[in-house]
């Protein structure tokens, strides 16, 4: 029996919304404070000290002589605060030691913004172009020119991690990966070869999200956010430190959105939790659990004429095919940290994720069929993907400080299995199966890095990484009836239609890939808080299984796709300079140039599906910058202006390609600037303008279609 899958979680949201509020507001002994924010209202139990002070006051009322209880309560508050400061300080120190482009995003500071998807979190990360094409969680992310192909739904080129454990699949794809942007305390964005500490060697690098725990969170927090086009985001968090050994945190969140275009609704629910166990004074274990159910309607693409006529409409194909991207994901992870002594530590963890995808994405296309018995216009193809993907990951890290060295040795092991198939799309309902598809991937990354402090001013950072990968795709084409009639032969469209359709393609392909990638960085400390750096790094990225599936020819047993290889050089500076006690500036500037061989790009022929191929020579180069400051308007710092500007200049081109010459790669703009200039009052009030300026970008490899530049001006 066909049905739309999965069912909408809207009813769940409407039922749980009042329960969520009640859970957080009905909490005897804890005082809640209201705080007005732009586009949101946050009711938050004032971190640890306020909670502790409330408890202490209650105990005083009960017994004014119980001094020991009061002292114990105060001491606990200091421990929680110290834990929080140490985690952020360690992350900041690691960024400061990296001789390349790395940005630390404090997500707690984003809670006074309208953050609804990944693009909002990455807004001020230089070098990373991120945008939601329709305003929902389907976000396009390109870091240093990664993911610039017709097959960008796989979202490859950037490795996502959560608490150091993989979110990205073992083959490198991020298809349907959704990380709730507010489920983390901070995120580390390491671009290009600077992500080697995570085992990544791709062009885009890695982004690691670090989760909050009960040790660095308020006991209760409620956030409500509303906006135009039916936007509602709600999340509630409760946490508790049970004793010196056990703690736990639980978050329930939901998102509803009608969308600014037709057929653009989204319903999402998420449940996240983590539980810590201090096994001994030197061993800590933490378990992470998450569940996400995310239903999204996809409005499809518009031509320029259609957009100019009505930018709010959905495409006819999206409506006819009832395009959707519906996922249900369960994930469990566990991580143990052993502090061996004051100079060494060992981390080991594992993760498992199960994801079900229901994805009507291609409406019925009609073309003449030369082999069809009755002739005339008949189905060329349509597609609905229904599959289940499972990912297993293991990560281990050993850190050792000795003499003037900070050594890191690491291992990542990942396995991916994706089983399901493509079906005839009957207006969003599942028809007959056209292709039974199984994908498998294994990936091993071994890496080592040393920060060698030559002097107080100079630090040398040699590193090396090894990649061992296996890819395998089995695509069994099934005979299906067309318009109630059996096929007398495999589908053949007349040559002028150039249709490489989903029904006719079958075959199996597998291959193994091995690469060794050295890196060498050098840093010079100008002052305690400012430095210059440079590095040279080898880049390496095997194809994803989506690339291989788009490269299979019928009956083949291997793929001719090679791994992308390249060399990147980089130089830059970052730092913070205090002008006086109330005024300061901070900056982060990087320039890089990368020569790539065998970059994997998927080119879409007219009326066909993407074909993945290697391109011999491409160049990725750019300038990345982030500058900000804090400037007092009076002698006490009551009134301050805090400007911030992120800017990126891109140059991504073919290099004497036999087909495309020196054309620019599509999708990424020539430049983009994102900034704000906020006024802050010491009482917590703020307001100011925000702006975006995005340059032109090409829509195809032949550079025949250009997407105009644009600017946005806002206020918060």
Language-model features: where?
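N-terminal periplasmic "start-of-domain" segments of outer-membrane beta-barrel proteins
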Residues: 59, 66-67, 76-113, 139-142, ...
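Extracytoplasmic beta-strand/coil segments of soluble accessory domains associated
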Residues: 87, 91-94, 99, 119-165
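Short acidic/polar hinge/loop motifs at secondary-structure boundaries
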Residues: 130, 158, 164-191
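Transmembrane beta-barrel wall of Gram-negative outer-membrane proteins
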Residues: 219-221, 226-256, 261-299, 323-345, ...
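Face-selective signature of the C-terminal outer-membrane beta-barrel domain
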Residues: 278-290, 325-494, 587-591, 627-630, ...
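Structural signature of Gram-negative outer-membrane beta-barrels, strongest in the C-terminal barrel
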Residues: 280, 401-414, 437-594, 678
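Membrane-embedded beta-barrel scaffold of Gram-negative outer-membrane proteins
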Residues: 345-363, 525, 531-537, 562-630, ...
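Gram-negative outer-membrane beta-barrel transporters
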Residues: 456, 460, 468, 584-597, ...
């Amino acid at each position: 029996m066909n049905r739309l899958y999965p069912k909408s979680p809207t009813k769940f949201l409407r039922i749980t919304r009042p329960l969520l509020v009640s859970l957080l507001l009905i909490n005897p002994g804890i005082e809640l404070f209201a705080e007005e924010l732009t586009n949101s209202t946050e009711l938050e139990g004032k971190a640890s000290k306020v909670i502790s002070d409330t408890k202490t006051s209650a105990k005083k009322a009960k017994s004014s002589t119980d001094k020991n209880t009061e002292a114990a309560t105060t001491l606990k508050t200091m421990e929680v605060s110290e834990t929080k400061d140490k985690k952020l300080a360690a992350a900041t120190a690691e960024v400061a030691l990296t001789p390349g482009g790395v940005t630390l995003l404090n997500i707690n500071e984003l809670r006074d913004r309208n953050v609804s998807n990944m693009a909002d979190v990455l807004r001020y990360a230089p070098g990373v172009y991120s945008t939601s094409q329709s305003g929902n969680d389907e976000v396009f992310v390109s870091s240093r020119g990664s993911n610039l192909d017709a097959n960008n739904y796989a979202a490859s080129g950037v490795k996502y991690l959560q608490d150091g454990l993989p979110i990205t699949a073992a083959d490198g794809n991020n298809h349907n990966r959704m990380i709730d942007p507010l489920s983390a305390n901070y995120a580390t964005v390491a671009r290009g070869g600077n992500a080697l500490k995570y085992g990544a060697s791709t062009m885009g690098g890695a982004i690691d999200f670090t989760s909050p725990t009960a040790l660095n969170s308020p006991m209760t927090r409620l956030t409500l956010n509303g906006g135009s086009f039916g936007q509602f985001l709600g999340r509630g968090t409760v946490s508790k430190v049970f004793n010196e050994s056990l703690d736990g945190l639980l978050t329930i969140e939901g998102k509803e959105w009608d969308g600014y275009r037709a057929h653009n609704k989204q319903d999402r629910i998420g449940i996240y939790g983590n539980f810590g166990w201090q096994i001994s004074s030197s061993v800590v274990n933490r378990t992470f659990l998450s569940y996400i159910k995310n239903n999204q309607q996809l409005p499809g693409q518009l031509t320029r004429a259609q957009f100019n006529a009505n930018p709010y409409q959905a495409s006819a194909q999206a409506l006819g095919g009832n395009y959707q991207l519906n996922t249900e994901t369960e994930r469990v992870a566990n991580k143990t940290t052993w502090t061996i002594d004051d100079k060494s530590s060992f981390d080991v963890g594992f993760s498992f994720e199960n994801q079900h995808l229901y994805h009507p994405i291609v409406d019925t296309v009609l073309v003449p069929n030369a082999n069809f018995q009755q002739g005339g216009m008949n189905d060329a193809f349509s597609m609905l993907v229904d599959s289940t993907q499972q990912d297993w990951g293991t990560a281990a890290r050993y850190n050792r400080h000795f003499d003037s060295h900070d050594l890191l040795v690491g291992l990542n092991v990942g396995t991916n299995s994706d089983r399901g198939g493509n079906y005839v799309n009957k207006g969003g309902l599942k028809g007959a199966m056209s292709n039974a598809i199984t994908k498998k991937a294994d990936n091993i990354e071994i890496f080592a890095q040393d920060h060698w402090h030559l002097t107080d001013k100079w630090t040398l950072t040699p590193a090396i990484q090894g990649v061992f990968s296996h890819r395998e795709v089995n695509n069994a084409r099934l005979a299906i009836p067309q318009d109630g009639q059996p096929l007398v032969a495999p589908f053949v469209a007349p040559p002028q239609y150039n249709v490489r359709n989903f029904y006719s393609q079958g075959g199996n392909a597998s291959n193994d890939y091995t690469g060794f990638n050295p890196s060498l960085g050098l840093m010079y400390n100008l002052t305690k808080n400012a430095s210059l750096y440079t590095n040279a790094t080898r880049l390496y990225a095997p194809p994803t299984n989506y690339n291989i599936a788009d490269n299979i020819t019928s009956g083949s047993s291997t793929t001719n796709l090679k791994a992308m290889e390249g060399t990147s050089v980089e130089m830059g500076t970052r730092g913070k300079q205090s002008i006086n006690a109330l005024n300061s500036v901070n900056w982060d500037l990087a320039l890089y140039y990368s020569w790539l061989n065998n970059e994997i790009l998927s080119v879409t022929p007219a009326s066909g599906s993407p074909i993945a191929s290697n391109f011999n020579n491409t160049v990725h180069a750019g300038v990345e910058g982030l500058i900000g400051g804090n400037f007092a308007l009076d002698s006490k710092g009551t009134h301050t202006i805090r400007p911030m500007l992120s800017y990126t200049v891109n140059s991504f081109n073919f290099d004497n390609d036999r087909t495309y010459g020196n054309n620019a790669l599509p999708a990424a703009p020539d430049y983009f600037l994102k900034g704000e200039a906020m006024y802050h009052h010491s009482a917590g009030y703020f307001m100011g303008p925000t702006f975006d300026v995005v340059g032109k970008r090409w829509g195809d490899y032949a550079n025949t279609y250009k997407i105009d530049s644009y600017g946005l001006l806002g206020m918060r």
